């Protein structure tokens, strides 16, 4: 098969193993940190098959590229302009959008064009830049997802400690640290990336590792640092968050039932107050709470003076109170956590095949090449780019405030012209004033004239 033939021609002499950046069959992170640019000579396959494959590939690349650029630019604009969305969590989502936009703009065109031209024409500088920027983008996205998970865990499960440091300035420092750490981690990519000839007038952007052992060590290191360890941290954090939210909703449900029963029988605390849990350092103990005082799923203890006033106050009969504001805030937090979980799952689903293929190729290159050449590796390649365009779709479908902010931003950028009031036709009678307008007119006339 042509992929295996080309892979053999790329290896070259010497102790180092070469990983091509110009091939759909080459690992994304071991090659360009993601980009294999197909440099197949047109004579390798039949003309009809190659043209059909290229048409499908161009269409998919174009759709993913437009969705990635348009969606992430929209996220950056909306989060930047909307004051209501300037929260700590959204600051990390903004950084995530920037990294996805970097992945789309800096890597996708330089992956597709060599596919069409059959050779890499952009030179060594662009070759090294593609490799480095894609690695940085993937690393930043992973670290941002870890930071979001830890921030949500602190806000929901450790609210008292989180209030000390959970600020936008602290989030900005964490985001800066993720970008710097990712930049340092991906330094080996530009060092071992180069453009080499693999045939007559055919160039490839590829990696030349010093030895096979170095390539294997690098693959395992990335698998641990950017996949397994972040995956475990995120899973544990969201597991604890889900447990805390479930306990908060469960306690609120019990308190609401007790409050309604007390209001029907002998009356109870006004405003839906009921014995509830207060979370301290992850634990819960029953105290009296007031609805809506805390938005992190943790009830706040009622001061003694208010308890005394509550005891002396006789409740007035009225309708059974509805859902408490505190429960509504817990439900809102649950929706946000659900959205973040979807983002994390989609990211790891898109990149799991890439990491698996990279590790497989590092330890068994010929076997991986035989099994994945052709359509499978092309699908894996495109799947990694899909991760850059799914987040805007998730926000639009699962984030009500983001949808409203998008509408507000569009209305601000494209204001509608004022509507002119329809004029009555010549043969139409003038509109008859309503009873309410007549009453206002009479009242205005009497008030203006004053007493007679």
From Swiss-Prot:
It comes from the Eukaryota. Parietal cells, pancreas, brain and various neoplastic tissues. Glycans are attached at residues 7, 30, 36. The chain crosses the membrane at residues 58-79, 88-109, 132-150, 171-189, 220-242, 339-360, 379-399. The keyword Transmembrane helix applies. Residues 1-21, 257-286, 421-452 are annotated as: Disordered. Disulfide bonds join 127-205. Keywords: Cell membrane, Disulfide bond, G-protein coupled receptor, Glycoprotein, Lipoprotein, Membrane, Palmitate, Receptor, Transducer, Transmembrane, Transmembrane helix. A lipid is attached at residue 413 (S-palmitoyl cysteine). Residues 1-57, 110-131, 190-219, 361-378 are extracellular. GO terms for molecular function: cholecystokinin receptor activity; gastrin receptor activity; neuropeptide receptor activity; peptide hormone binding; type B gastrin/cholecystokinin receptor binding. Residues 80-87, 151-170, 243-338, 400-452 are cytoplasmic. Residues 434-452 have a biased composition (Polar residues). It is a multi-pass membrane protein. GO terms for biological process: behavioral defense response; cholecystokinin signaling pathway; digestive tract development; ERK1 and ERK2 cascade; estrous cycle; gastric acid secretion; gland development; histamine secretion. SUPFAM superfamilies: Family A G protein-coupled receptor-like. It is found in: Cell membrane. GO terms for cellular component: membrane; plasma membrane. Belongs to the G-protein coupled receptor 1 family. Receptor for gastrin and cholecystokinin. The CCK-B receptors occur throughout the central nervous system where they modulate anxiety, analgesia, arousal, and neuroleptic activity. This receptor mediates its action by association with G proteins that activate a phosphatidylinositol-calcium second messenger system. This is Gastrin/cholecystokinin type B receptor. It comes from Rattus norvegicus. The gene is Cckbr.
């Amino acid at each position: 098969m042509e992929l295996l033939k080309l892979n053999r021609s790329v290896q070259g002499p010497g102790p180092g193993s070469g990983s091509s950046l110009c091939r759909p069959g080459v690992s994304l992170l071991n090659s360009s940190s993601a980009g294999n640019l197909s440099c197949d000579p047109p004579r390798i396959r039949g003309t009809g098959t190659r043209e059909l494959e290229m048409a499908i590939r161009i269409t998919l690349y174009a759709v993913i590229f437009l969705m990635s650029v348009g969606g992430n630019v929209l996220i950056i604009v909306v989060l930047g302009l909307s004051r209501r969305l300037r929260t700590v969590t959204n600051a990390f989502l903004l950084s995530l959008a920037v990294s996805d936009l970097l992945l789309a703009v800096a890597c996708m065109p330089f992956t597709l064009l060599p596919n069409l031209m059959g050779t890499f024409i952009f030179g060594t500088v662009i070759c090294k830049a593609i490799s480095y920027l894609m690695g940085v983008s993937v690393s930043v996205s992973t670290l941002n997802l870890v930071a979001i998970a830890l921030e949500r865990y602190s806000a929901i499960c450790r609210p008292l400690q989180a209030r000390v440091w959970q600020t936008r300035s602290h989030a900005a420092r964490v985001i800066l640290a993720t970008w710097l750490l990712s930049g340092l981690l991906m330094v080996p990519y530009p060092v071992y990336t180069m453009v080499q000839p693999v045939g007559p007038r055919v160039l490839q952007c590829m990696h030349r590792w010093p030895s096979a052992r170095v390539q294997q060590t690098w693959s395992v290191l990335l698998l641990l640092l950017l996949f397994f360890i972040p995956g475990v941290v995120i899973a544990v954090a969201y597991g604890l968050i889900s447990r805390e939210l479930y306990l908060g909703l469960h306690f609120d449900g019990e308190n609401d039932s007790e409050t309604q029963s007390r209001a029907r029988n002998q009356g109870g605390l006004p405003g839906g107050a009921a014995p509830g849990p207060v979370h301290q350092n992850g634990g819960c103990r029953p105290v009296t709470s007031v609805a809506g005082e805390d938005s992190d799923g943790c009830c706040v203890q009622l001061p003694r003076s208010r308890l005394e006033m509550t005891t002396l106050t006789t409740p007035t009969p009225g309708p059974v109170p509805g859902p408490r504001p505190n429960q509504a805030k817990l439900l809102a937090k649950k929706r946000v956590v659900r959205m973040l979980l979807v983002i994390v799952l989609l990211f790891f689903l898109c990149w799991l095949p890439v990491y698996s293929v990279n590790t497989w190729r590092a330890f068994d290159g010929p076997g991986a090449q035989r099994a994945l050449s052709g359509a499978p590796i092309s699908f894996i390649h495109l799947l990694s780019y899909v991760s850059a365009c799914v987040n805007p779709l998730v926000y639009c479908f699962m984030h009500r405030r983001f949808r409203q902010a998008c509408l507000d931003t569009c209305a601000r950028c494209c204001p509608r012209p004022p509507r002119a009031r329809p004029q009555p036709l010549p043969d139409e009678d003038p509109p008859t004033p309503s009873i309410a307008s007549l009453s206002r007119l009479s009242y205005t006339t009497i008030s203006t004239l004053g007493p007679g």
